[in-house]
Swiss-Prot record:
It comes from Prochlorococcus marinus (strain MIT 9312). Belongs to the THF1 family. It holds the Pfam family ThylakoidFormat. It comes from the Bacteria. This is Protein Thf1. The keyword Lyase does not apply. HAMAP family: Thf1. Keywords: Coiled coil. May be involved in photosynthetic membrane biogenesis. NCBIfam families: PS_II_psb29 (TIGR03060).
Length: 201
């Protein structure tokens, strides 16, 4: 069994594995993921299930969009996993296989499959909640609904899985807000670059 690492240990190991400067826009995101993975690794009841794998790979992918150089992203993900006692390759494989299993399904079919695959009680975490949200948001009927109907659909599914609806709504809200803020920040940076370029002409 691997030794439990402190957050400080994980950060030190991460920087040994990833010896590059992380662009300022992404530093907070990377730090938050590292701390969260470290804390989950200390929870005795936590299990690395397929929902956790989907949540981790897909939120990482979404929140690091536009990261330069792009070729560093695989190493960045691997370094986050290594420094918190997780296996990056295994997580990616489980995520890919599981998402394929849930693709092209209605929200009702997704809920049915979620219940079938959840043999034991799901360990609640932000990453797991986001994994479920990502599966639901990719369902055939989800995109056809308005925001009120979407929120109700999400709440109903979390309740039927015996997970906190309020916690899920909060986690999803923060996640969507983070994506929005990242997009706004990237637009401002791009606008500034254009202005700076015009000044040099």
């Amino acid at each position: 069994m691997k030794a439990k690492l402190t957050v400080s240990d994980s950060k030190k190991l991460f920087h040994e594995e990833f010896p590059y400067v992380i662009p300022g826009l992404y530093k907070r995101i990377v730090d938050e993921i590292l701390v969260e993975l470290n804390l989950l690794n200390h929870q005795n009841e936590f299990k690395q299930d397929y929902l956790f794998c989907i949540g981790l790979t897909e939120t990482f992918k979404e929140l690091t969009k536009g990261y330069k150089p792009e070729k560093h992203l695989d190493l960045l993900f691997e370094s986050l996993c290594i420094s918190t006692n997780f296996e990056a390759k295994e997580i990616k494989e489980i995520s890919k296989i599981s998402q394929k299993e849930f693709s092209d399904k209605s929200s009702k079919d997704i809920l049915k499959l979620l219940k079938e695959k959840s043999n034991s009680k799901l360990y609640p975490s932000r990453i797991l909640n986001l994994g479920i949200y990502i599966l639901i948001s990719n369902s055939q009927d989800f995109k056809e609904n308005n925001d009120i109907e979407k929120n109700k659909m999400i709440s109903d599914i979390f309740e039927k899985l015996s997970l906190s609806r309020n916690k899920a709504e909060k986690d999803i809200g923060i996640y969507k807000s983070s994506i929005s803020k990242m997009e706004q920040a990237k637009e401002l940076i791009q606008e500034q670059r254009i202005k700076d370029k015009k000044k040099t002409l």
